[in-house]
């Protein structure tokens, strides 16, 4: 079987070129595109200012290529207008977008006006956000799950990210779906009693577990609706529900396997960061503790931590790398700029 990396870094992110390199680089564009929204940010390195633009979804799997590209360009235009600059003044632009076919987004952007832009999968942006674009691992667990890492010699590896039908183990969707399954097993006696049963009826406004099961096939729930139920799973786990806690332990084990695969295939050893990105980690210790234990079983010195900076920060860090000014702004200062800009919108 082919064992080449599923995701690699574009040459421009390993050998910076940029439109305007070095001291001439002032404006960098970063974009974070997902299944629900798109955020563009223009970073003014001279004035230490950030200008944002917002648009709808840009995940091609969710809305198609045409609408995805339109969202990216609409968000960009807003951010450029906020910065009072033209497109040609950008030193670099990095688009981190969710979906299975970022190459299609790349082609369509090149066919419009963005022939110099760098398009990567959102897991690459997440890795950069988590590690400061340095050797280490970024592990996403939001609605879906995905893990990506870069080793000290530049080797890359992705594990997971196969979508909710074939994967997304350890994600909010997985937790929500398995919580409903646990309620079904409680009802038919094939599983232990759990407070997830009553919680599922209230959350999905269903009169019975049987009706909930039937409705899934007649009016399928969206990924977001299923993933949202994981909040209830978290609440019940903290309240001591055994089944809810077991689900988080299973989620940690499955996601931990993917993280271990990334560590093994990138050659990461010793002290390196493993950044946890996504809404599922808001569950706290019921999820993060068993996941950390799973990681430390193979990498005892790894630093495991929840990432606080918004994902668009990773795109901006990669943009600075692309135009040869990596380190012009550290992660802490960038995170503060993003937090302030988001608070004003």
Model-found features: residue ranges?
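Broad gene-expression machinery/nucleic-acid interaction feature
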Residues: 37, 92, 144
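Residues at the starts of beta-strands that form the adenosine-phosphate
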Residues: 92, 116, 273
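Phosphate-binding/catalytic loop of phosphoryl-transfer enzymes
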Residues: 96-194, 331, 342-345
């Amino acid at each position: 079987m082919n064992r080449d990396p599923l995701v690699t870094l574009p040459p421009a992110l390993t050998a910076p070129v940029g439109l305007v390199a070095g001291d001439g680089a002032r404006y960098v564009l970063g974009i974070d595109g997902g299944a629900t929204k798109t955020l563009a940010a223009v970073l003014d390195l001279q004035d230490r200012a950030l200008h944002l633009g917002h648009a709808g979804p840009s995940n091609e799997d969710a809305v198609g290529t045409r609408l995805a590209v339109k969202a990216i360009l609409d968000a960009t235009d807003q951010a450029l207008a906020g910065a009072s600059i033209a497109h040609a003044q950008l030193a670099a632009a990095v688009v981190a977008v969710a979906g299975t076919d970022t190459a299609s987004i790349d082609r369509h952007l090149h066919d419009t006006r963005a022939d110099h832009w760098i398009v990567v999968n959102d897991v690459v942006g997440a890795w950069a956000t988590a590690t400061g674009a340095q050797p280490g691992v970024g592990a996403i667990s939001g609605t879906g799950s995905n893990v990506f890492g870069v080793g000290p010699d530049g080797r890359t590896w992705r594990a997971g990210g196969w979508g909710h039908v074939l994967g997304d183990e350890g994600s909010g969707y997985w937790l929500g779906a398995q919580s409903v399954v646990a309620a079904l097993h409680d009802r038919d006696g094939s599983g232990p009693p759990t407070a997830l049963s009553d919680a599922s009826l209230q959350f999905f406004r269903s009169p019975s577990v049987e009706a909930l099961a039937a409705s899934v096939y007649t009016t399928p729930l969206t990924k977001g609706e299923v993933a949202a139920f994981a909040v209830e799973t978290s609440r019940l786990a903290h309240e001591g529900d055994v089944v809810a806690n077991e689900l988080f332990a299973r989620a940690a084990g499955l996601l931990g396997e993917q993280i271990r695969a990334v560590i093994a295939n990138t050659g990461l050893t010793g002290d390196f960061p493993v950044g946890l990105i996504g809404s599922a980690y808001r569950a706290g210790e019921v999820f993060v503790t068993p996941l950390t234990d799973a990681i430390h079983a193979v990498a005892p010195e790894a630093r495991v931590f929840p990432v606080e900076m918004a994902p668009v920060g990773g795109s901006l860090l990669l943009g600075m790398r692309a135009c040869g000014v990596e380190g012009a702004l550290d992660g802490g200062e960038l995170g503060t700029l993003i937090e302030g800009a988001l608070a004003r919108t």
